[in-house]
Amino acid sequence: AQGDSGYDIKMDATPAYGGMGEGATPTEMLLAALAGCIGIDVTMILNRYLDKISKLEFITDGTRKEEAPKGFVAITITFVVDGDIDGKRVWRAIDLSEEKYCSVSDSLNAEITYDIILNGVKLTREV
C-alpha cells in the first residue's frame, strides 16, 4: 500500500495466518498509527520544552478480544520521557492530543461504514 505521503507501507499476515511475515500486521500498524499520531501531537505541544527533554519514546500494547473479530478492547500507550519537565505538562499534552488533535484515537471511537467499488461501480448495500 502507498499512503498520501508517497511512502510505501508493507503489510502482511504472520505465517500462522497464511502470510509470509514480510511486513507489519494490520493490528501492529493500528497501534503504530495511534502511537505516531499522539506522539507527534505531544512532541508538537511540548515543542518549547524539547531542549529539556533527552528522551521521548512511545510504547504501545493492546489487549484483543478472544474471538473473531479480535479487535482491541484495551490499548495502553506508555510515554517514556527523560528530562527536566514537569509531569503535569506531559499529561496535559497527552490530554490535548486525545481530546482535540489526534484523528487516529478519534477514529477508534467512530462508527465504521463501508463502501465497495466493484469493477469501477460503487455498490449499494442492497446488492
Where are these regions (language model features)?
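Extended beta-strand/beta-hairpin segments
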Residues: 1-32, 43-127
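Alpha-helical metal-binding/catalytic segments enriched in His/Glu/Asp
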Residues: 34-38
